[in-house]
Amino acid sequence: MIQQQTTDQYIKVCMKTWLLCEASVHAESTSTSPRHNLVKECSECAKACFAVVSRLVSNAGDLGDLVLNCLLHCRQCSNECEKYPGEEDIQFCGIVSSICADTLKEIAVHQLN
């Protein structure tokens, strides 16, 4: 089982990513010419992060494939965001998604042991 202090850290990182991805999805969806790949990747990342947070908050124990799924979607979101270097909000979303993916590696390694 993951220690509570560490669990809180994972929750904070995933929540921050979820919020930023949701904000990016909203901003893109309401723009005059939304970038559909960006909306898709940010939306999938947000859903995956929220699933991890929900499981961690409920103290359900086994995270199953949620961590690897989230790690994958965070990486894909980060890669998509990197395609728009002139846009600070999108770049920040990508950075936070990358940090989330790196942080979730710790849980993934812990689950393998």
PLM features per residue range, with description:
Residues 1-113:
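Amphipathic alpha-helical hairpins
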